[in-house]
């Protein structure tokens, strides 16, 4: 049985449309969580403008990065730290909530013996949040380390670990095991995994650029929530795509779990 991208896209889209209300609900809650955390830790408008003015003439070379950092005062370094903490923490917690609830929802719906309920889903997924926090932090760390060296290694890391969030919801699968199995599955299905991950990253980059401008210019929080929501909805579609591919791969080889 061959697995084509076209069939996967259609299958994922059908599931996505059928569950659109639940998807919007979880995506909205995740967006609100991310926005609240971002608001709590984000530097105020004056601090952001000060930082923006400092880097306005920065051309991006490594030497200039070192020079810029050395030129910063302790207060400006603290502002940069708060900005970084705000972005990373809001993304980490929001994604942990989103991934745990969406994958739990898919597991429940696929198991026709169980009835899906939003509030029961939140309760069931809450026990998975610590594992997702750890896994997402680890994936983000490895991906950013790869991108710090060169862009391609970071993308490769993300591609090969893309099944691990699905796998850790299975019984007796540790974070380490989920990573190992994810690499194995991805290696066997690289032609159907890589294109969708590349597309997802491109869309996320566009959203990131726009939302970063919103942060610098101090737009309303409701507008930022909207961009978080759009990002979450797109991410959910990718999760559904990857889950469907995982199921088909499991049927095809029947030896991943």
Curated annotation (Swiss-Prot):
Record GO cellular component, one term: plasma membrane
Signal sequence region: none
InterPro entries registered for this protein in UniProt: UPF0259
Transmembrane segments annotated in the record for this chain: 23-43, 89-109, 122-142, 148-168, 190-210, 223-243
Keywords, in A-Z order: Cell membrane, Membrane, Transmembrane, Transmembrane helix
Domain of life according to the entry: Bacteria
NCBIfam families xrefs: PRK02868.1
Protein family (similarity comment): Belongs to the UPF0259 family.
Record's protein name: UPF0259 membrane protein WIGBR3650
Protein species of origin: Wigglesworthia glossinidia brevipalpis
């Amino acid at each position: 049985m061959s697995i084509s991208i076209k069939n996967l896209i259609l299958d994922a889209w059908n599931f996505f449309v059928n569950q659109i209300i639940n998807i919007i609900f979880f995506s909205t809650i995740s967006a609100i969580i991310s926005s609240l955390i971002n608001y709590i830790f984000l530097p105020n408008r004056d601090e952001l403008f000060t930082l923006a003015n400092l880097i306005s003439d920065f051309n991006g070379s490594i030497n200039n990065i070192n020079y810029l950092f050395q030129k910063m005062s302790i207060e400006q370094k603290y502002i940069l730290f708060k900005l970084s903490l705000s972005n990373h923490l809001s993304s980490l917690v929001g994604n942990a909530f989103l991934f745990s609830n969406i994958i739990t929802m898919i597991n429940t719906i696929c198991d026709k013996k169980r009835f899906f309920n939003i509030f029961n889903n939140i309760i069931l997924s809450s026990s998975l949040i610590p594992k997702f926090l750890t896994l997402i932090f680890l994936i983000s760390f490895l991906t950013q380390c790869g991108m710090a060296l060169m862009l391609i290694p970071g993308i490769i890391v993300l591609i090969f670990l893309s099944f691990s969030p699905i796998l850790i919801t299975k019984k007796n699968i540790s974070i380490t095991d989920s990573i190992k199995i994810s690499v194995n599955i991805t290696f066997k299905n690289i032609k159907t995994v890589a294109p969708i991950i590349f597309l997802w990253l491109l869309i996320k980059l566009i959203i990131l650029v726009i939302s970063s401008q919103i942060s610098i210019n101090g737009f309303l929080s409701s507008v930022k929530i909207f961009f978080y929501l759009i990002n979450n909805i797109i991410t959910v579609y990718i999760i559904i795509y990857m889950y469907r591919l995982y199921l088909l791969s499991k049927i095809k080889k029947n030896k991943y779990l």
